[in-house]
């Protein structure tokens, strides 16, 4: 059954009414780029995002039903806003402990987590990948056993984290066992918070059981704009039945704390219209897209195997990503990305080893064919053999062993700082996380000492400048 679009309908009626726009925004609905007639502000009847009781509330109710959550809230400032609000809510709900609040988090977190820690002033204890899993900056598999051990270790120190924070799917398409981690969190009475920015579509796979809320997460964020037909900036904050705070006013206040007082009605209309798309056959189109990608990966891997490539080319990943191991072709990820670019294929992300390509049902058949043709052309012209490098990232392992925290994240972020060349940063204290976006995953965290391994890793990922404290704390 098709879902209503109350925000879109209101704005279209207003745009067609001929009303004199003696209110913001300044373009007055006159077309410059084409969208201006539908760009409005909080006029009468338009509702208000952080105090919604009209058309926005109706639209969010539609999204809540579609995502199967206790309550779904809109964000016009991406998952970054939702991450900060989610952490704020978990912090508010945590029992008073008489000590600094601590979050247990997988190390491959987006830098939005660090900004939240700086603004909310909490500490982070990191979950690092096991040595055999330390293959890339973007990945940090966390097993139920590892999480249990970390929570037990904190308990022995008299500490109880206000939340466990996991990124899934990660930038390379890796997926955590959310159901198992949720059970561990339940046993310890700690909410599981999931950065599901790359996985909004998971709800609409068969049975909808792969979405974090369905798997037991207390709260999660989804970037609608990453994998659903939503314009950039459109995102969701989802609350599950285990969310520590369910009060609507508290949630909207947390979102308002980190959001603009002028949310984009263009983005709100996009989120609203997306509800209708999701209700009109989207799951079938999604399933067909995933099937095409399964066949695409198989074809690429069969071609690579026929040329005796030293390892799989298309890695196992979440359904809508194609993650290519360029080392299987004797190339770097950036070299492979450039070769694809010459074939009119633009990737989402490339690093020294991997190339990530993101598909959705909105991609036409030409896109699948073009990628397949471009990669097969490269495979057919290989002149190997060549060795496959180890998957373990030595610098990442050394980074954990050399870790030394000198001050809190908040102290570092708000302290006087300066930029220095990366090679001159050894021994200095990291101020702001320095890493490109994508993937926006910090190599060194604010407040940590920059070590030789950190410098090597920054250089590997082409980070040439580091923000450091001017003085030692």
Where are each of the predicted segments found?
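General small-molecule cofactor/ligand-binding pocket signal
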Residues: 73, 123-127, 348
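N-terminal "arm"/small-domain region of PLP-dependent enzymes with the aminotransferase-like
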Residues: 1-54, 190
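Conserved PLP-enzyme active-site core in the AAT-like
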Residues: 4-12, 78-310
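Conserved C-terminal alpha-helix-loop-beta "cap" of PLP-dependent enzymes
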Residues: 301-452, 457-463
């Amino acid at each position: 059954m098709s879902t209503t679009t109350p925000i879109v309908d209101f704005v279209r009626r207003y745009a067609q009414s001929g009303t004199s726009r003696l209110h913001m925004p300044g373009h007055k609905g006159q077309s410059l780029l084409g969208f201006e007639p539908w760009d409005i502000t909080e006029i009468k009847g338009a509702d208000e995002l952080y105090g919604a009781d009209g058309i926005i509330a109706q639209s969010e109710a539609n999204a809540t039903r579609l995502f199967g959550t206790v309550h779904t809230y809109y964000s016009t400032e991406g998952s970054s806003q939702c991450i900060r609000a989610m952490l704020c809510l978990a912090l508010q709900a945590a029992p008073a402990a008489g000590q600094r609040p601590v979050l247990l988090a997988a190390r491959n977190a987006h830098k939005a987590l660090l900004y939240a820690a700086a603004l909310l002033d909490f500490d982070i204890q990191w979950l690092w990948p096991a040595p055999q899993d330390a293959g890339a900056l973007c990945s940090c598999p966390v097993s139920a056993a590892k999480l249990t051990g970390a929570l037990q270790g904190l308990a022995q120190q008299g500490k109880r984290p206000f939340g466990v924070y996991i990124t899934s799917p990660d930038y390379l398409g890796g997926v955590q066992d959310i159901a198992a981690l949720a059970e561990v969190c339940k046993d310890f009475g700690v909410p599981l918070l999931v950065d599901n920015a790359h996985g909004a579509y998971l709800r609409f796979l068969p049975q909808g059981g792969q979405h974090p809320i369905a798997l037991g997460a207390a709260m999660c964020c989804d970037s609608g704009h990453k994998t659903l037909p939503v314009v950039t900036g459109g995102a969701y904050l989802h609350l599950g039945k285990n969310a520590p705070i369910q009060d609507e006013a508290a949630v909207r206040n947390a979102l308002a704390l980190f959001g603009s007082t002028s949310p984009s009605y263009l983005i709100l209309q996009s989120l609203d219209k997306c509800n209708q798309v999701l209700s009109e056959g989207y799951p079938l189109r999604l399933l067909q897209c995933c099937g095409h990608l399964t066949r695409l990966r198989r074809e690429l891997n069969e071609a690579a195997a026929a040329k005796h490539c030293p390892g799989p080319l298309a890695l196992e990943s979440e359904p809508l990503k194609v993650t290519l191991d360029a080392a299987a072709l004797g190339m770097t990820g950036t070299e492979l990305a450039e070769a694809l670019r010459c074939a009119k294929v633009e990737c989402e992300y490339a690093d020294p080893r991997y190339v990530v390509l993101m598909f959705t049902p909105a991609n036409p058949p030409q896109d699948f064919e073009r990628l397949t043709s471009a990669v097969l052309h490269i495979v057919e012209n290989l002149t190997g053999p060549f060795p496959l490098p180890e998957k373990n990232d030595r610098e990442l392992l050394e980074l954990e062993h050399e870790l030394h925290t000198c001050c809190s994240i908040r102290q570092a972020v708000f302290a006087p700082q300066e930029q220095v060349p990366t090679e001159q940063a050894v021994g200095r204290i990291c101020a702001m996380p320095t890493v490109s976006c994508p993937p926006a995953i910090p190599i060194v965290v604010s407040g940590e000492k920059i070590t030789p391994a950190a410098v090597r890793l920054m250089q590997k990922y082409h980070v040439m400048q580091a923000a450091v404290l001017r003085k030692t704390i």
